[in-house]
């Protein structure tokens, strides 16, 4: 019997003593049938190298606050508990354990970070914990029965960037700069697969650490390669630093980056150097008139007025909304609120609109929730769609996880 099962047993025993004979007794931790409240939680980098990622968590919290204010999810209120992990994978595991054993969460929801979420997988499997909407992109998520990721594998996104560069912009000399962790390695896998299928060799491939602030040597390698374009997969601080290094060296490059850097916070870091950068994005533009995106803008302005309205927030909102969609489907099914039934409800989600994402689908054995991306471009402090949504390049999307 694992720790989670022991917690379920002790919780059910306590409730039975208080409410003998009640048909509403919970057999899952994090479920309060009397108050009709579900407790979920996540880890987030309030400290460490990327504290601005807390914007993601604020937006997820704004989603739950907004839902609760409107009567909850099918009448159930959500208590959302978040703890700082400093963007340190070792701490993330400890935080996940604390959330289960001390805060008694029903599911891990919208936890932030690729490497951090990957590190938490063994504990989540051991403890029977569902991970819904991990805010990171890695192939490790897609075959796990207890994980429902909304974000794509960054390899698919890197392949989408390369596809647009080659097929639409007719570029051939492309360099990749990639964060030396699971985020960047995932991007590199997809990029390499697409380039190989296109019979075009990358002119350079340069790893960097997430804490890198000076990209001078990295950009020197890119410039010396004769690259026409550079695809960077790292944080918005990394992108801004790379753009500044390129500017200092007068390196003329067409830049590409992942969706989460298409955010007002990146303009604050990079200024007008960001203009012209392309971004692959599984999310609708933040200024979309779609009701779910409008709801995000209104809620984050209400609950976190100091936060910018941007893709970081829409990302967090959408991952929280994924839990809302799956939990709502579980309630509609009429089945007991258990972890197993939550997984079953998730596996039945088909072509769903979830926050700023569309056509989200999960089936048993295939948890690749997001299946298409658009291309955005930075223009004058905004992000404009320059190519509509299309499926990910099959060579990356259908590749077996490494």
Language model: regions and residue ranges:
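Extracytoplasmic "Venus flytrap"
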Residues: 30-34, 41-60, 83-90, 112-115, ...
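Extracellular/periplasmic Venus flytrap/periplasmic-binding protein
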Residues: 94, 139-140, 145-250, 286-294
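Segments of small-molecule ligand-sensing domains
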Residues: 302-313, 324-386
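Extracellular/periplasmic periplasmic-binding protein-like sensory domains
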Residues: 243-317, 389-400
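N-terminal export signals
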Residues: 5-25
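Beta-alpha junction/loop-to-helix N-cap segments that form part of ligand/metal-binding clefts
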Residues: 27-29, 52-58, 70-141, 208-215, ...
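Immediate post-signal peptide segment of exported/extracytoplasmic ligand-binding proteins
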Residues: 26-40, 73-77, 166-172
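Venus flytrap/periplasmic-binding-protein-like
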Residues: 85, 132-133, 138-139, 210-211, ...
